[in-house]
Amino acid sequence: MTHSLTFYHFGRALVLSLVWLLASCGGGGGSSNTPPSPAVTVPPGANVQALRVGPGPAGSGRVVNLLYTSVRLCVPGSSTNCQTIDNVLVDTGSAGSLPLPLVKVADQQLYNCVQFIDQSYMWGPVATADVYLGGTALDGEKAASLRIQLAGTTGAATAPSVCASTGFTPITAVSDLGANGILGIGPDREDCGIDCEFITNNGYYHVDQGGGDLTGIAISRAEQLLQPVTRFAANNNGTLISLPAVPSTGAASATGALIFGIGTQANNAPGTVSKMAPNPSGYFATTFDGRTL
């Protein structure tokens, strides 16, 4: 028996980090007997973002059950100096040659570090972009002047040991990540929060004092990597992910939708659902194969 999947995220965070790489796009082909790709029917709207489960960008070997979307970035204030980034990984975080303005603190370049549970990390300078999501032309929702991390940037200062901890592997290429960037859905409005406001050696934010000499820096929550959804003018109180049923034999790919807002439009009414509130760390307990996780 198969079931379609619909996930509601109430007040969840979306922190955007992008791999700064020039990479060709596309995926592998399938044979003529490949089963059709399941899809869900979602009413169109400016708050609807297309999702795809399937092959990732060329050069990537990590293509199993990854959820991809596209993001449009523009130089702040411009509607023409823009670039669409395909094969961006949607997670519960290649900009080509778009000249985004880098963020400096007291004339020193600001850097950001993010570590993942699989003992990998992303490191790069912080830049500012207008981020567009939703709508058929990725022009439905706008997060203006959003700070993002540009991982894999040529010429960037080397990550400090607090970021590149022993045993951690850097993500600097499409082949490392299996995507051109990350659009992460997490439990917080910022990537670090209150700790980074008052703690200098917070592990997240650093400034280059010259010649690659890095030092930790405290950053206010308003100046951290913020979630794009809360910066939207409307449809900014949560997200909904809708994916189709997939037969037990599997499918080569599937398409779904990321819908912005909860109960703000006809296409995002939650109906009767079970609400599961996360703990302060963003986790909740579940049971799998007789084990509580």
PLM region descriptions:
Residues 2-15:
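Bacterial N-terminal signal peptides that target proteins for export
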Residues 18-46:
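Bacterial Sec-dependent N-terminal signal peptides
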Residues 37-65, 144-150, 157-293:
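Aspartyl protease catalytic domain
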Residues 63, 74, 79-85, 90-162:
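Signature of the N-terminal lobe/flap region of pepsin-like aspartyl proteases
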Residues 68-83, 283-293:
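A short acidic-Thr-Gly-centered motif at the start of a beta-strand
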Residues 71, 127-131, 241, 286:
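Short acidic-hydrophobic surface loop/beta-edge motif
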